[in-house]
Amino acid sequence: MSKKKILYLNLSTNEKDISLGFSNSWLSKFADKFESVDLISLNISSNNQTEFKNVNIFGISEPEKLSRIDKYLKLKNLVKDLTQKNDYSICFSHMSPLLSIIANWYNKNKKTISILWYTHPMPKELIKKIVLFISLFFNNQIVTASESSFPYFSKKVNVIGHAIDYDAFLNKKTNISNNNFVILSRISKSKNLELSIDSFLKSKFNQDSITVIGDAVTDADMEYKAFLAEKYKTKNNVIFKGMIPHKELPDILRSYSYHINSTPPGFYDKSVLETLAAGIYNFYLNADYDKHFDPKALKYTKFSSKQNTLTDLLNSVYELNNNKILEIVSFAQNSVSKESIETISDRVLSTVEN
């Protein structure tokens, strides 16, 4: 397969984006594999134009205020123009089924191989469900992070793991210096933050602190954030730190020893993988993370959504000695190295290489 040119589609190039601040690290790995990359993005940051030497950036810039129709027309014309002028071997769409459909519909070169990366539960809106389903027919391969992170069954779906900056987050711990808890998460009802916080407050760790790092994205998220602030306003050990730039997270995480993730199957959150790389002990709900732990350790890491299950688990770990905790952390830390950003382009492209 030729690796001269790739058409790369994504939602944002803004490193300050709450949900997609990591997307440029993905782009850089594909830029290393191809002679030239043409990027079409729905949100172009003003400082991106000179960041990548072999990447040409097109799309919709932050200051532009376009209607949905105007956005569609601009994207359609971009795809038509670029595919008429260039012979792309690959069209890769990162978390945008709609862009992948537009690109493939208007692509003049039908030999281009199309790959969609999608890692998320089933969309709630009917139109988004339909778009995601239709994208199955427009892409040669679908790549996703875990067994439950693509909501439709298809032989095209390939589970390849996630992509974290393992080397940046890596922190080999030799002791547990504190009992500080962190929840690294977008503030949203879907993340079950109350389950995590309430269970912590009822546990033997309740004299320690729990910090939520992350922020709201949608209007509904903002309402939920206000609700949480009101609910826990008398709890001085429940801290809402807000969003931290992704590049600063490795240093910030050094202050914590435990992380809770209460998201259900479908969410294969990078936060679990990043905190594991950072040497932080994890409590989780989604069985997709089981693969990163010694089977004998699952009774100390995985909980269910039933009442008091997480509290009981926290209490059992409270009684564990530090050596056992470090042993569990070390095993998981080594395992998540397989999901490093350094290998993401190879893992994606291997699904279409002969």
Question: Where does each model-flagged region fall?
Answer:
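Nucleotide-activated donor-binding/catalytic signature segment of Leloir-type glycosyltransferases, i.e.
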Residues: 225-244
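Aromatic "clamp/platform" in nucleotide-sugar-dependent glycosyltransferases that forms part
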Residues: 263-264
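Short His-centered aromatic/hydrophobic patch
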Residues: 92-99, 118-121
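N-terminal subdomain of nucleotide-sugar transferases
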Residues: 1-46, 201-202, 341-345, 353
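A conserved, positively charged/aromatic
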Residues: 31, 114-143, 150-153
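A charged, aromatic-enriched C-terminal amphipathic alpha-helix characteristic of glycosyltransferases
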Residues: 304-309, 319-353
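Acidic anion/phosphate-binding donor-loop and adjacent secondary structure
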Residues: 67, 151, 159, 163-179, ...
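Conserved donor-binding/catalytic core segment of Leloir-type glycosyltransferases
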Residues: 7-9, 173-191, 197-202, 211-213
